[in-house]
Structures are given as structure tokens and as C-alpha cells.
Curated annotation (Swiss-Prot):
Keywords: Cell inner membrane, Cell membrane, Membrane, Transmembrane, Transmembrane helix. GO terms for cellular component: plasma membrane. The chain crosses the membrane at residues 3-23, 39-59, 72-92, 93-113, 134-154. It is a multi-pass membrane protein. It comes from Escherichia coli (strain K12). This is Inner membrane protein YgjV.
């Protein structure tokens, strides 16, 4: 097996991990699954030799986990500076800056936005990644980000319609425990 096909295999694994990410209405589960996906796709990009994308994806994974604990603007600024610095230091072609831009805007969204607004900004970020992945020849990366674009776009429309009907799509229903079901 060549390094190229190993990289593509890791990309397909990332595809399988990430395919259901945007169906999560629970933001904690959404962020955890997004973090795992980001780490695996980061390995994929390093194996392909697209280092700005690999570094951006690994920073995405770490950043997404950290947003579960804090929404500090200082922490956000650190991730934005790291992403921009690493991306600018390693890029060789202008298209390699798209994942850096996508990571910066999604960092802002994860720290400063919630619900539908966060998902809309994430959709824009996904557009940046789709263009990059196609350019880089990433089969799994293009498949997953293209799927993210479609699924997140459809879910944005679905959640927006729910809000128009007065339903909070991000309110997670709690199942009653066995103790509560006596009766």
C-alpha cells in the first residue's frame, strides 16, 4: 500500500466518523464528535502532505474540546493567532489558506455563537474546506466536507423552520429516569 492510499484510507475513516456529526442537536455531543473527526482528518492531511490543513484540523480538534470548558475570548484569540501563524508559515499555494480561514471563522463561531448562528458560520467554514479538499485531491476529505455541507445545510433549514413554528430545535429532551416512571 502506498502512502497515498494510506492517507485516503484514513480520510474514509474520518468520513465514517463525521457523517452523523451535524445531526446532533446536543451541542456537547456535537462538539465531541466534531473533535474526533477533526483529529482523524488532520492525520489524513498530514499524510497527504498538506500541512496547513493538517495543522488547522488538529487545532480544530483541540479547540473544539476546549470550547466545552470555556468560552473565554482570550482562549479564542490564542487559537486564532496559532491557526493564522501556522497556516501562513506553511502554505505554498493560496488555496492552502482556505482551511486556515475556515478554522478561524469556526473558532469564532464555537466561542461566540450558539444554535443556528453557530451552524451557519460552520457551514461557511465547510465551504472553505470543500474547495481545499477538492484541490488537494482528498477523496475522503471532499466526501465528508461535501456531506457536511449538504447535511448541515439541510439541518439549518430544518432547525430554522422549527424556530419559525416556535420550537427550540436545540432544546434537548431528557428521558425520564426509571425512578420518575413509577406510577
Amino acid at each position: 500500500m502506498t502512502a497515498y492510499w494510506l492517507a485516503q484510507g484514513v480520510g474514509v475513516i474520518a468520513f465514517l466518523i463525521g457523517i452523523t456529526t451535524f445531526f446532533n442537536r446536543d451541542e456537547r455531543r456535537f462538539k465531541k464528535q466534531l473533535s474526533v473527526y477533526s483529529a482523524v482528518i488532520g492525520v489524513h492531511f498530514f499524510l497527504l502532505g498538506t500541512y496547513p490543513a493538517g495543522a488547522s484540523a488538529i487545532l480544530n480538534a483541540i479547540r473544539t474540546l476546549i470550547t466545552l470548558r470555556t468560552r473565554s475570548l482570550w482562549v479564542m484569540a490564542i487559537f486564532i493567532v496559532l491557526t493564522g501563524g501556522i497556516g501562513l508559515a506553511k502554505f505554498h499555494h493560496p488555496v492552502e489558506l482556505l482551511p486556515v480561514i475556515g478554522t478561524i471563522v469556526s473558532t469564532w463561531a464555537l466561542f461566540c455563537c450558539k444554535g443556528l448562528t453557530m451552524r451557519c458560520v460552520m457551514w461557511f467554514s465547510t465551504c472553505c474546506w470543500v474547495i481545499h479538499n477538492f484541490w488537494a485531491g482528498s477523496i475522503g476529505g471532499t466526501m465528508i466536507e461535501g456531506s457536511f455541507l449538504l447535511m448541515n445545510g439541510l439541518n439549518i433549514i430544518r432547525f430554522w423552520r422549527m424556530q419559525k413554528r416556535g420550537i427550540d430545535p436545540f432544546k434537548v429532551e431528557k428521558t425520564p429516569s426509571a425512578v420518575d416512571e413509577r406510577g
